[in-house]
């Protein structure tokens, strides 16, 4: 059966890295028989330019009907102070599709160890996943700003916590079987609920070790001993901070993918970096985050584990061969990097 994939190229370098990723997808599909069709839609700044809205109605309709969604990058300086901004489209898309679970793999490629701000012995063997609750908590609570007082409400239901904890256990079960739940239960009521739910869900996963860590301690460990972690799960605010902290371990945002999952609808796959408008159109953008996001899509949405493994191995082999774009210390163009990865599939 043909799989429908909606491609949201977005802004800046987005169209360039999207096309690079789709070239890799087409190549692996030709080799393995994966049948798919691409539906390109405007989104972000491109959506505003086309329709006046960052998430056009037709784009949302196509996304709802898709089997998976690829997003490259959004954001443009021309909208920095505008009433309608590209980023509003992403928030709306997450809400409309109920994308409650954000997944960020953090893996250090040995050939890029020198880029990390940490010493080689600190980052050796780092390979973990951050699972962040994406649709609840303080970001979606009431925000009250008065003249001399302000309040932000951090609100979680049992059901919201249970589904993200369960998702994290399922991921841990297929890895090293260690789940670290991060909270601030010595202070926050929401964290007390979080820890209680984690303990209850753990009974359904006796093969997975559950550990608890306070968020301040976890932030320290992510720098002093990041290889300790296998799967991390935490609430929206803590997850936002910790996932950004984890992204600096590799020394570059150009090689890190992510996914956002709903309970029943399509998932969204995207690089963690921005639209880099300063290099848009120059043909020098690093496509690896986009390509690895496509590998995540093949594995998570379509169960094509071997295809995903082949892409990831090809990326690793390309980097090991010293073929690098400018952001990671080389001179390869977007096209040259893409062709090198395809040659190693």
Spell out what each predicted region is.
Residues 1-5:
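Extreme N-terminal starter segment of soluble prokaryotic enzymes
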Residues 21, 25, 198, 290-301, ...:
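Buried hydrophobic packing segments
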Residues 33-39, 175-183, 205-213, 303-310, ...:
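Flexible, glycine/charged-enriched surface loops at secondary-structure junctions
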Residues 33-57, 222:
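N-terminal beta-loop-helix "entrance" segment that forms/cooperates
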Residues 45-48, 114, 222-323:
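Glycine-rich phosphate/nucleotide-binding loop
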């Amino acid at each position: 059966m043909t799989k429908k994939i909606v491609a949201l190229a977005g802004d800046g370098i987005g169209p360039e890295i999207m096309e690079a990723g789709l070239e890799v997808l087409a190549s692996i599909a030709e080799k393995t028989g994966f049948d798919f069709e691409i539906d390109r839609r405007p989104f972000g700044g491109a959506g505003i330019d086309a329709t006046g809205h960052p998430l056009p109605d037709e784009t949302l309709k196509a996304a709802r009907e898709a089997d998976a969604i690829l997003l490259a990058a959004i954001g443009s300086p021309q909208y920095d102070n505008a009433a309608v901004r590209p980023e509003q489209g992403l928030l709306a898309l997450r809400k409309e599709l109920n994308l409650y679970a954000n997944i960020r793999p953090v893996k250090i490629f040995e050939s890029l160890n020198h880029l990390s701000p940490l010493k080689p012995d600190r980052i050796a063997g780092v390979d973990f996943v951050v699972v962040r609750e994406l649709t609840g908590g303080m970001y979606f609570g009431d925000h009250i700003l008065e003249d001399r007082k302000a309040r932000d409400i951090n609100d979680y239901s049992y059901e919201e916590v249970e589904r993200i904890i369960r998702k994290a256990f399922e991921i841990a079960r297929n890895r090293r079987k260690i789940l670290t739940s991060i909270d601030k239960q010595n202070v926050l009521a929401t964290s007390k609920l979080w820890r209680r739910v984690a303990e209850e869900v753990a009974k359904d996963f006796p093969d997975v070790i559950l550990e608890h860590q306070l968020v301040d301690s976890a932030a320290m460990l992510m720098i002093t001993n990041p290889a300790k972690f296998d799967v991390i799960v935490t609430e929206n605010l803590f997850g936002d901070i910790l996932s950004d902290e984890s992204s600096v371990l590799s020394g570059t945002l150009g090689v890190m993918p992510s996914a956002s999952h709903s309970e029943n609808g399509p998932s969204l796959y995207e690089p963690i970096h921005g639209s880099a408008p300063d290099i848009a159109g120059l043909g020098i953008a690093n496509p690896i985050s986009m390509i690895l996001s496509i590998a995540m899509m093949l594995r998570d949405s379509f169960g094509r584990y071997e295809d995903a493994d082949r892409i990831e191995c090809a990326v690793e082999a390309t980097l090991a061969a010293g073929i690098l774009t400018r952001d990671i210390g080389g001179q390869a163009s977007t096209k040259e990097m893409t062709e090198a990865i395809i040659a190693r599939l």
